[in-house]
Amino acid sequence: MFDIKEQLKLLPDKPGVYLMKNKANEIIYVGKAISLKNRVRQYFQSSNNQHPKVRAMVTHINFFEYIVTDSELEALILECNLIKENRPKYNVLLRDDKTYPYIKVTMNETFPRVLKTRKVLKDKAKYFGPYTNISALNETLEVIHQMYPIRVCGKNIEKMIERQERPCLNYHIRKCIGPCTGMVNDETYQQMIHEIILFLGGKEDELIKKIEEKMKRAAEKMDFEGAAHYRDQRQALLDIIERQKVVSVNDIDQDIIAMAKGEQESCVQVFFVRGGKLVQREHYILTTREDEDEKEILSAFIKQFYGETNFIPKEVLVEREVEDQELMAQWLTNKRGNHVKVRAPLRGEKKSMIQLVKRNAALTMGQREETQRKSKEKTEGAMVVLQEALGLADAIHRVEAFDISNTQGMESVGSMVVFEGGKPKNKDYRRFKIKTIQGANDYGSIEEIIYRRYKRGVDETKAMIENTMTVQEGKFSLFPDLIMVDGGLGQVTSVKKGLAALGILIPVCGMVKDERHRTRGLVYEGKEIPIERPSHLLRFITQVQDEVHRFAITYHRSLRTKSILHSVLEDIPGIGEKRRKSLMKHFESIDKMKQATIEELIEVEGLNRKVAENMYHFFRKQ
C-alpha cells in the first residue's frame, strides 16, 4: 500500500516532474518543480493557505509518482508533453486543442504539398497555426494555390512516373506543374515551396522582393507571360498586406497575448505581428475555474500553445508577468534557435496593444457566454418543458431513444441514441443486431433490444457491487431518466414489456408523427400529448427522432452492403474471409472493385497478382 507520509520523506531535492493520481490510477495533475522535495510536500501541509482548487485536488490524491530531470528547463519540457498526452483534470487545459487546424507543408515528401490538417506529427513537415478561424485558413490556402501551381493530390509521384500514368486535370488547366510527368525540375518546385514558407511565416516583404526580381528578369528575357504571372503574384500579396494593420514602426515579429475570464472557461486572444504588421488574430478557449489565478492560466496557455506551434517570434508580450517567465523565455529561445523575450509591458505603445488585445478577448468571451446561454435555453430548457409536459416528479437529464430498421424483415437492427442535458452523447450510442425475432416485427424487435440493453445494465451494476467491475469499465450501467421510442402506443407497450421482465421502472414515451411525417406529439401513459409548434421542445423531439433513425438506417445499410459484398466475393477463387475484409476496407463498394485495374487490386493488403487477375477477369465476364 502507498504510504504518502513515507513517500514524502523519500523525495529528492532535485528538479523534476510529479504526477498526482487518484484511486482509479488516473493522472489528475502534472506539475514541475526545481525541488521535488519542497514542492510536492507543500500539497500535504496545512490547507489553510491553499487555493480552493488545490484543496479539492488533494482530497482526490491517492498516490503520486515523480520523474527526476537534469534541469528545470528539462522539467518544463517534460511537463508540457505529459499534460498534452494525459490532459489531467486539475491542469488548466486548452479546450478541444486537438481540433484546431494547422497548415501543413509536407517537407517529408519529394514534391511537398500544402494542406489543412488537425494532427501535428513528428514527420519532418512544417506546421503553421493553429487557426481557430477556419475561413482565414481556407482563404490562405486559396491564395497559395492561386499563386503557386503545386500539387494537391496525395499520390505516389515516383510510382506514377515509373508507370507513366497520365497527369490529372489540374495539370491540363495549369493549376499544377505536374511533377508526376517526370519533367519538373526539383529545384524549381522547391523554390515555390520556399516562397510559400516565407509567406506563411509572415515574410511577405521579403517574398515581394524575390517576386519583383523574377518579374524583372522575365521581362528582360522578353518572357512577357512569365512577367505577367509574377506581376499577378505580387499584386495578390500587396492586396493581403493592404488589409494588414501596421502596429509597430519596428520591423519585428511579436505575439501579443491577453485574456478574459469567465465562470468555467477563459478566452486567450493572440495578435500575431509579423514585420511590424498585424497579420492574424486568433482566440483560444481554456477550461478554468472562476477563482483560477490568471498567472497560472497564462502560463498554462503559453506552454500548450508554443509546445505545438513551429514558429516562435522574437518577442512574446503578455498582459501580466507569468509563472516561470525567465524559464519560459529560455525554453522558447531553445525552440527558436536565438534569443526570445517574454515580457509584460507597463507603458507605451506595447502596453496600448496589450489593452487592445484584452478588449478583444473580453468581447469574444462575452459573445461566447451569450451564445452558451441561448444554447442552454434550447437544450436544458427543453428538458424542463419535457418534464412538465409528461408531469414527471424528477428532472430529466439523460434520455435514451430507440428505433428499428429492416428491409422486408431482412437484416433487422436496433439503435439506441443518448442525449444528456438536451445534447447528443455520441460515445454512449449503441447498436443491436436482432437475434430472436424473425421477419418484420418491430414490436418484438423493440422488446428484444430493450431487454438486452437493460439486462446488461443490471448485470454490470451487480458486478460493481461485487467489486468485479469498475465504474469506468461499465458501458450499460448508467440508466436514463426517460426512454423515448420512435412510434406510438404499440412501441411504448413493447418497451414496457422488456423493462417489466427485468423488474425495472423507467418512464417511457413514444414520438408520433402526422400524415406528412412531421413530429406531432408524444404518447405517454396511454394519452397523446400535443407539442406546441414551433418550440424548443419540438426541435428537441425532432432531433431525437432524426438521430435515432439515422443511426439505425446507417447500421442497417452497412450490414446490407457487407452481406452483398460477402456473397459476391465468395464466388471468386482465392478470396477467403481475410481477403474479403481487406477488399471491403480498401474499396467499400462492389462498383469500385469492378472498376479497379489489376495494379490497383494488387495494392490491397494480402492480394497477390494471381488473385488480383482472378478478380479482374471475374468482373469482366459478368
UniProtKB/Swiss-Prot annotation:
Biological processes, Gene Ontology terms: nucleotide-excision repair; SOS response
Main subcellular localisation = cytoplasm
Q: Which residues form the UVR domain?
A: 205-240
Q: The GIY-YIG domain covers which part of the protein?
A: 13-92
Kindly state the subunit structure of this protein: Interacts with UvrB in an incision complex.
Its annotated function is as follows: The UvrABC repair system catalyzes the recognition and processing of DNA lesions. UvrC both incises the 5' and 3' sides of the lesion. The N-terminal half is responsible for the 3' incision and the C-terminal half is responsible for the 5' incision.
Name the record gives this protein:
UvrABC system protein C
